[in-house]
Amino acid sequence: MGDIFSARVAGNIENTDIIGSMEFSCKVAGAKLIAVIGHTNCGAVKGACDHVEMGNLTALLSKIQPAVYDEKTELQSRNSNNPVFVEKVAVINVKRMVHAIVERSPI
């Protein structure tokens, strides 16, 4: 199977450091697969759904906010009290981050 090179961040957001780590793992360490993994009941996604503002977390959550706005099927209870809404936002967020990684990385 091989080794796992892991770069973790709340809300599985992308940034220059995370993308740089992915590029290192592929180009230098020889990784052949990158997985962006969201999870149920993600606190960062819930924070974005609730429009939380708290210190440096605010900037991180702002990267998840587009997924909140992109989710159009849940018209009521668009907050963390609605587990269906949170799950849909989490899925959209993963897809958005995969797209951003592909767009931003030349490797």
Locate each region found by the language model.
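Divalent-metal-activated hydrolytic enzyme cores
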Residues: 2, 11-32, 43-107
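Conserved beta-strand scaffold positions in the cores of enzyme catalytic domains, especially
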Residues: 4-6
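Short beta-strand segments
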Residues: 8, 35-39
